[in-house]
A protein has these predicted regions:
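Extracytoplasmic/periplasmic proteins that interact with beta-lactams or build/remodel peptidoglycan
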Residues: 1-44, 64-67
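Beta-lactam-recognizing serine transpeptidase/beta-lactamase-like catalytic domain environment
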Residues: 2-6, 19, 45, 49-85, ...
Length: 198
């Protein structure tokens, strides 16, 4: 005959979601409005409590009915799509400048609205004369030019190290299906534009 072993069932642990349904509803609403307003193919948002790390909302503009085969087969774009983090990278770079002692937040730089290096021109998102900004002012104004100037002595290896310390190019640990770790190339492959815009 066949031998079988029977193992008694045990109660599982409680699972508590950190999603706030009101925040989730509002985020979905804003995403649909933004998608329509800007003619975007889709939109995503993640709202996180910065103190606890809890995810309060994780949404994309796609309409998929929960529990359906489509929902099971389609991971959320909020975790599966790779995208450029944009000006969030300025905060990461700035933390590296400060930790390495390259700058203090009170250091001042004369920042024009554009700069050209090796035939490539980089601009701020708004026109302005040459401004005397502290590093805090550069961050406040989200100045691309100011960040390039402040990062002139910031080694690529250190830049890469800080990006990885902040989780760029790595999975989040949410363990959601289809999660992408993103893309972060080795600094040995960076060209000037990558270095200045990463």
């Amino acid at each position: 005959g066949t031998m079988t072993e029977s193992v008694a069932a045990k109660n599982g642990d409680d699972v508590t979601l950190t999603i706030d349904r009101d925040v989730q509803w509002y985020v979905k609403k804003v995403l649909k409005e933004a998608e329509s307003k800007y003619g975007a193919a889709w939109a995503i948002a993640v709202v996180q409590d910065v103190q606890s790390g809890e995810i309060l909302a994780l949404a994309d503009s796609d309409e998929v009915q929960a529990g359906t085969d489509a929902a099971k087969m389609s991971p959320s774009r909020a975790v599966s799509e790779t995208f450029e983090p944009g000006s969030v990278g300025k905060v990461i770079s700035m933390s590296g400048y400060l930790q390495m002692g390259l700058h203090k937040m009170s250091d001042q730089l004369s920042v024009p609205d554009h700069i050209t290096q090796e035939g490539q021109t980089y601009k701020d998102s708004f026109d302005h004369g040459t401004e005397r900004w502290t590093l805090a002012g550069i961050l406040q104004n989200s100045s691309n030019v100011g960040m390039i100037m402040a990062g002139e002595n910031y080694p690529d290896e250190q830049r890469y190290e800080y990006l990885t310390k902040f989780g760029i190019g790595q999975p989040t640990g949410l363990n959601l299906p289809g999660e992408s770790s993103g893309l972060l190339t080795n600094p040995s492959a960076w060209d000037l534009r990558t270095r200045n815009t990463i």
